[in-house]
Amino acid sequence: MAIELLYDADADLSIIQGRKVAVIGYGSQGHAHAQCLRDSGVEVVIGLREGSKSSEKAQEAGFEVKSNADAAAWADVIMLLAPDTSQAEIFSHDIEPNLKDGDALLFGHGLNIHFELIKPAVNITVGMVAPKGPGHLVRRQFVDGKGVPCLIAVAQDPKGEGKDLALSYAAAIGGARAGVIPTTFREETETDLFGEQVVLCGGLEHLMMKGFEVLAEAGYAPEMAYFEVLHEMKLIVDLIWEGGIENMNYSISETAELGGYVAGPRIITPEVKENMKAVLADIQSGKFVRDMVADVEAGQPELKRYREEIAAHPIEATGSKLRDLMSWVKNPLDETA
């Protein structure tokens, strides 16, 4: 089924220009949304919790910073860009008591609405504007007169304005310059979680670690194992990102290309595909999110345990040592330590 693509000519920028927008959160996406909205002639304030380290950054950028509750009371469009695990609490404590008839509540990701962790009143427009790129890219492309493609969706539309409002907002952050794709909260949420868990984060992470273990256990130097299964990953991913799998195969040696064809199906077997389907089923049923919420309520012991296990894996110590040799590689964790 062909997707619908919408552009600036399809959007009415005056819709969002006529609203007062509170951006809740000033992280990667929050700073980009706020600055692009302001440059597009939209009245914007930033909502942050008391004591947030982002307050100074937002004020230095020229924004008025309010508490989450005061920002919600002031605005008639609220974009909630806090972390997924914080959104339900922010909504119930700060936003919900301050919602007014006709307000719109927007999200950058559909998880909390799709899995009903947040349930706005029926008189509230609920939509999503999700750029398919990190905030710094959204901002840079906007400044350059371009844009990052956006997904939009509507979950509640009491006034029949949801799609037009979401499209107007997407245009104001540059998305309609590149293309805006209407979708649903369900589709965005479930495919996003699946991609993260099966390929981008969980799958890739464990593929690299297992490859490292096989080489190290076979007697090869850990440094060589790191180079071959992790360091060179960026080279390959960049080729795929730029031109697809065909471009990657075109760009590598014939030896590497043939080896990939021969060995790939031995690693990613039909059983692996069945495991992927099982992960998708856990996402669709809500099991993953229920488990995540339970972990958050318990103080995140599971998340902390997983982090400790990864930090203790020898691939991390080996990588840290080797990256010290690479002056062109900067570790963001070093800057926040």
UniProtKB/Swiss-Prot annotation:
<feature type="binding site">
    <location>
        <position position="192"/>
    </location>
    <ligand>
        <name>Mg(2+) 2</name>
    </ligand>
</feature>
<comment type="similarity">
    <text>Belongs to the ketol-acid reductoisomerase family.</text>
</comment>
<dbReference type="GO" id="GO:0009099">
    <property type="term" value="P:L-valine biosynthetic process"/>
</dbReference>
<feature type="binding site">
    <location>
        <position position="192"/>
    </location>
    <ligand>
        <name>Mg(2+) 1</name>
    </ligand>
</feature>
<keyword id="KW-0479">Metal-binding</keyword>
<feature type="binding site">
    <location>
        <begin position="26"/>
        <end position="29"/>
    </location>
    <ligand>
        <name>NADP(+)</name>
    </ligand>
</feature>
<comment type="function">
    <text>Involved in the biosynthesis of branched-chain amino acids (BCAA). Catalyzes an alkyl-migration followed by a ketol-acid reduction of (S)-2-acetolactate (S2AL) to yield (R)-2,3-dihydroxy-isovalerate. In the isomerase reaction, S2AL is rearranged via a Mg-dependent methyl migration to produce 3-hydroxy-3-methyl-2-ketobutyrate (HMKB). In the reductase reaction, this 2-ketoacid undergoes a metal-dependent reduction by NADPH to yield (R)-2,3-dihydroxy-isovalerate.</text>
</comment>
<keyword id="KW-0028">Amino-acid biosynthesis</keyword>
<feature type="active site">
    <location>
        <position position="109"/>
    </location>
</feature>
<dbReference type="GO" id="GO:0000287">
    <property type="term" value="F:magnesium ion binding"/>
</dbReference>
<dbReference type="InterPro" id="IPR013116">
    <property type="entry name" value="KARI_N"/>
</dbReference>
<dbReference type="Pfam" id="PF07991">
    <property type="entry name" value="KARI_N"/>
</dbReference>
<feature type="domain" description="KARI N-terminal Rossmann">
    <location>
        <begin position="3"/>
        <end position="183"/>
    </location>
</feature>
<feature type="binding site">
    <location>
        <position position="49"/>
    </location>
    <ligand>
        <name>NADP(+)</name>
    </ligand>
</feature>
<keyword id="KW-0460">Magnesium</keyword>
<dbReference type="InterPro" id="IPR014359">
    <property type="entry name" value="KARI_prok"/>
</dbReference>
<comment type="pathway">
    <text>Amino-acid biosynthesis; L-valine biosynthesis; L-valine from pyruvate: step 2/4.</text>
</comment>
<dbReference type="GO" id="GO:0009097">
    <property type="term" value="P:isoleucine biosynthetic process"/>
</dbReference>
<feature type="binding site">
    <location>
        <position position="232"/>
    </location>
    <ligand>
        <name>Mg(2+) 2</name>
    </ligand>
</feature>
<dbReference type="GO" id="GO:0004455">
    <property type="term" value="F:ketol-acid reductoisomerase activity"/>
</dbReference>
<feature type="binding site">
    <location>
        <begin position="84"/>
        <end position="87"/>
    </location>
    <ligand>
        <name>NADP(+)</name>
    </ligand>
</feature>
<dbReference type="InterPro" id="IPR036291">
    <property type="entry name" value="NAD(P)-bd_dom_sf"/>
</dbReference>
<feature type="binding site">
    <location>
        <position position="135"/>
    </location>
    <ligand>
        <name>NADP(+)</name>
    </ligand>
</feature>
<dbReference type="GO" id="GO:0005829">
    <property type="term" value="C:cytosol"/>
</dbReference>
<feature type="domain" description="KARI C-terminal knotted">
    <location>
        <begin position="184"/>
        <end position="329"/>
    </location>
</feature>
<dbReference type="InterPro" id="IPR008927">
    <property type="entry name" value="6-PGluconate_DH-like_C_sf"/>
</dbReference>
<dbReference type="GO" id="GO:0050661">
    <property type="term" value="F:NADP binding"/>
</dbReference>
<protein>
    <recommendedName>
        <fullName>Ketol-acid reductoisomerase (NADP(+))</fullName>
        <ecNumber>1.1.1.86</ecNumber>
    </recommendedName>
</protein>
<feature type="binding site">
    <location>
        <position position="253"/>
    </location>
    <ligand>
        <name>substrate</name>
    </ligand>
</feature>
<feature type="binding site">
    <location>
        <position position="54"/>
    </location>
    <ligand>
        <name>NADP(+)</name>
    </ligand>
</feature>
<keyword id="KW-0560">Oxidoreductase</keyword>
<keyword id="KW-0100">Branched-chain amino acid biosynthesis</keyword>
<feature type="binding site">
    <location>
        <position position="228"/>
    </location>
    <ligand>
        <name>Mg(2+) 2</name>
    </ligand>
</feature>
<dbReference type="InterPro" id="IPR013023">
    <property type="entry name" value="KARI"/>
</dbReference>
<dbReference type="Pfam" id="PF01450">
    <property type="entry name" value="KARI_C"/>
</dbReference>
<dbReference type="InterPro" id="IPR000506">
    <property type="entry name" value="KARI_C"/>
</dbReference>
<keyword id="KW-0521">NADP</keyword>
<feature type="binding site">
    <location>
        <position position="52"/>
    </location>
    <ligand>
        <name>NADP(+)</name>
    </ligand>
</feature>
<comment type="pathway">
    <text>Amino-acid biosynthesis; L-isoleucine biosynthesis; L-isoleucine from 2-oxobutanoate: step 2/4.</text>
</comment>
<feature type="binding site">
    <location>
        <position position="196"/>
    </location>
    <ligand>
        <name>Mg(2+) 1</name>
    </ligand>
</feature>
